[in-house]
């Protein structure tokens, strides 16, 4: 049994969540085209991106002749009314996203892929998040903190954005970017146990 794992992600939240489990993480690049296909549903898009990131990371590992540790990739999508809300590219886009989420319930999909020994294991987790009604002053003050700019849907549940969440049905860590319960189950399939069972 080993606990070393390649994490092909730039998300500091994913790194922190996995380090809290006592895993030795190694960075691995996984650059892909993340453009959505026409009429692609949010959960399908999310799963595809996590899978393609994993395949890209596997190719990098092989090309660089790196040790054969399992590879973990993940992706997160926020969706409301069938529209995918990615990371805002500018402040006005963040304003528009937060206005769409204000006072409403939206879906957060988090896909996780773990590969080892030429096998790929994957799951997708869905959560429903309800925002309180936001005033314009709250939206602009939140955006001024800079927090929304690197997060799908323009908010972070684990930080200041958490004050907008009226109700969560699902996984708190999933909305952060990595559903821990499901992730640990996938890791077990590649012989990484967080705790002995």
Swiss-Prot record:
Belongs to the Maf family. NCBIfam families: maf. Its EC number is 3.6.1.9. It is found in: Cytoplasm. Its cofactor is a divalent metal cation. This is Nucleoside triphosphate pyrophosphatase. Nucleoside triphosphate pyrophosphatase. May have a dual role in cell division arrest and in preventing the incorporation of modified nucleotides into cellular nucleic acids. It comes from Haemophilus ducreyi (strain 35000HP / ATCC 700724). It catalyses: a ribonucleoside 5'-triphosphate + H2O = a ribonucleoside 5'-phosphate + diphosphate + H(+); a 2'-deoxyribonucleoside 5'-triphosphate + H2O = a 2'-deoxyribonucleoside 5'-phosphate + diphosphate + H(+). Pfam families: Maf. Keywords: Cytoplasm, Hydrolase, Nucleotide metabolism. The active site is at 75 (proton acceptor). GO terms for cellular component: cytoplasm. The keyword Cytoplasm applies. GO terms for biological process: nucleotide metabolic process. PANTHER family: BIFUNCTIONAL DTTP/UTP PYROPHOSPHATASE/METHYLTRANSFERASE PROTEIN-RELATED (PTHR43213), BIFUNCTIONAL DTTP_UTP PYROPHOSPHATASE_METHYLTRANSFERASE PROTEIN-RELATED (PTHR43213:SF5). It comes from the Bacteria. GO terms for molecular function: nucleoside triphosphate diphosphatase activity.
């Amino acid at each position: 049994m080993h606990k070393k794992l390649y994490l092909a992600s730039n998300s500091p939240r994913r790194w922190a969540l996995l380090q809290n489990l006592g895993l030795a993480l190694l960075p691995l690049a996984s650059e892909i085209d993340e453009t959505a296909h026409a009429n692609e549903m949010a959960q399908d898009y999310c799963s595809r991106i996590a899978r393609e990131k994993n395949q890209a990371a596997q190719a990098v590992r092989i090309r660089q002749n790196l040790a054969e540790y399992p590879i973990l990739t993940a992706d997160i999508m926020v969706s409301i009314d069938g529209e995918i809300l990615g990371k805002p590219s500018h402040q006005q886009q963040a304003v528009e996203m937060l206005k769409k989420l204000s006072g409403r319930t939206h879906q957060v999909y988090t896909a996780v892929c773990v590969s080892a020994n030429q096998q790929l294991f994957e799951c997708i987790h869905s959560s429903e998040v309800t925002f309180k009604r936001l005033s314009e002053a709250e939206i602009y003050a939140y955006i001024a903190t800079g927090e929304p700019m690197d997060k799908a849907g323009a908010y972070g549940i684990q930080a200041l954005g958490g004050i907008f969440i009226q109700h969560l049905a699902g996984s708190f860590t999933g909305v952060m970017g990595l559903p821990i319960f499901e992730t640990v189950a996938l890791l077990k399939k590649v012989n990484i146990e967080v705790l002995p069972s």
